């Protein structure tokens, strides 16, 4: 049930702290979810680029209700620090376990800290509630951002690359962004890739066309040129998921504090787990990595 809606999280992280309503939101995840049971085919009749974008958005939102759970490996780099984690999705939220830092396995002390963190989540009702609230918040705001995609931009055909059709996009001058996050989103231009056979969103690559100011610049701003990139693929037959995230944003918060977000993520080694999996069962899986690896 992993979705690109977790991607908008990166955009949210680039906003001045005083302006963020949900630090866990924005996962522009702008895209995704799971698999079409009956994918729509592209009609033979000419279709405008905006109509194609709208159909893709409708499909992705429809497929969000997929409730399959997956285990996968996350490689991420932020502020010069590299981490590798194993993630297991459950009906109660996702559980992660840190495997390495800067290409080095965890020390004995770090292993104990990870054990304690996972154990605390298993026994703390408040921690579990916080996890569920974060999941619900990111899903809700991700849907809102994704839903406005066809209205926020003007699309045009820009060629094709293999099985993908490339659409270029620019801000729609008549669109009025309803939120700060939407303003950052709307002030981008770039390219979007669509798998026309299944009408799935395969990629989104945008950059800020101008400096985005908050509170007339008094509360902060994001610099022109900030870059956001997401890739999605059919990771196993019939299942689409996010595989790559890139985010680079700079700016100022409250006139003085610098904003510098550089984030990279790669998602790989997807493995189906039970749709009824609990957090306790996920913790057990994460403690048996060799067994899971043998099943891949």
PLM features: residue spans?
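N-terminal polybasic/positive-inside topogenic patches
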Residues: 16-17
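Sec/Tat signal peptide C-region and signal peptidase I cleavage site
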Residues: 35-39
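Structured extracytoplasmic
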Residues: 40-189, 197-202, 207-226, 234-241, ...
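Bacterial N-terminal signal peptides
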Residues: 23-34
